[in-house]
C-alpha cells in the first residue's frame, strides 16, 4: 500500500525515490532546497541544519525579545543567505531600509520552513509574516506556497485574517521595500509562550492550541481545502 508521497512529488530534482517502506534521498542529486521537509506533514523527513525545533527556539526568542522591548505589529521577514540578504542590503544602501517593525529572519533556504514554523510565527505574537523567495527558485517554492495557503486558510478560519502571510518573489528591492512599508495593520495576536518541543505534529498542535485559545473565532473545526 502506497503511503504519503508529498516529498517525492515535490522534489524539484527527483532526488527522492521509494525504497520499500521508506524513501531514499540521493545526496548527489539533492539541491538542499528543503521543500520535502517543509511539505512533510509528520516530520518523517527533516532539514538537518538547523533542525525544525532549533529554528522555532530562535523564532520564539526573536519575537519574544521584540515584544518584551515594547515592540508592536511585528512582521517576520524570512529570507535566505543569498537572494534575501542581498535584497535587504540593497534596500539599506539605496532605499530607506527595513521598516522598524520588520524583523529579518535568516534561514538556509526559505523553502525549508513548514506549517509548524508558519503557525508558530503567529502563535508567538507576530502580526505578519513575509517570505522572500528568489525568482529563479520560484519553481522550487510550490511546496512552500501550498503550506502558506494552508496556514492562511487556518488563520482565516480562526478569525485572524488570511492576508497576514504572503510569499514575495520579486527581484526588485524597491518593490519589496514598498510592499513592506505598505503592509496593513491588523489586531495584535495574543502572545503564546509554549516551548518548541517534540516532533512536527506536536509543534503544529502546540501552535494551533495557542492560536485557538486566543482566537477571535474559536471554532472546533475548520474545513480544509481539497
Which residue stretches match the model-derived regions?
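Ferredoxin-type iron-sulfur electron-transfer modules and their immediate structural context
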Residues: 1-10, 14, 73-87, 105, ...
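A contiguous, basic/glycine-rich beta-loop/short-helix subdomain that forms a polymer-engagement track
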Residues: 24, 47-70
Amino acid at each position: 500500500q502506497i503511503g504519503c508521497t508529498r516529498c517525492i512529488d515535490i522534489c524539484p530534482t527527483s532526488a527522492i525515490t521509494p525504497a520499500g517502506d521508506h524513501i531514499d534521498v540521493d545526496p548527489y542529486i539533492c539541491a538542499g532546497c528543503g521543500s520535502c521537509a517543509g511539505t512533510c506533514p509528520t516530520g518523517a523527513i527533516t532539514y538537518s541544519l538547523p533542525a525544525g525545533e532549533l529554528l522555532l527556539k530562535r523564532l520564539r526568542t526573536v519575537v519574544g525579545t521584540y515584544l518584551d522591548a515594547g515592540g508592536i505589529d511585528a512582521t517576520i521577514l524570512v529570507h535566505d543567505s543569498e537572494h534575501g540578504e542581498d535584497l535587504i542590503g540593497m534596500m539599506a544602501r539605496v532605499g530607506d531600509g527595513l521598516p522598524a517593525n520588520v524583523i529579518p529572519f535568516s534561514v538556509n533556504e526559505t523553502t525549508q520552513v513548514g506549517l509548524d514554523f508558519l503557525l508558530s510565527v503567529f502563535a508567538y505574537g507576530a502580526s505578519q509574516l513575509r517570505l522572500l523567495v528568489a525568482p529563479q527558485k520560484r519553481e522550487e517554492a510550490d511546496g512552500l506556497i501550498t503550506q502558506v495557503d494552508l496556514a492562511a486558510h487556518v488563520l482565516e478560519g480562526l478569525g485572524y485574517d488570511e492576508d497576514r502571510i504572503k510569499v514575495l518573489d520579486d527581484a526588485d528591492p524597491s518593490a519589496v521595500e514598498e510592499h513592506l512599508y505598505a503592509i496593513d495593520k491588523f489586531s495584535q495576536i495574543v502572545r503564546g509562550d509554549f516551548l518548541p518541543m517534540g516532533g512536527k505534529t506536536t509543534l503544529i498542535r502546540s501552535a494551533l492550541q495557542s492560536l485557538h485559545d486566543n482566537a477571535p473565532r474559536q471554532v472546533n473545526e475548520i474545513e480544509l481545502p481539497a
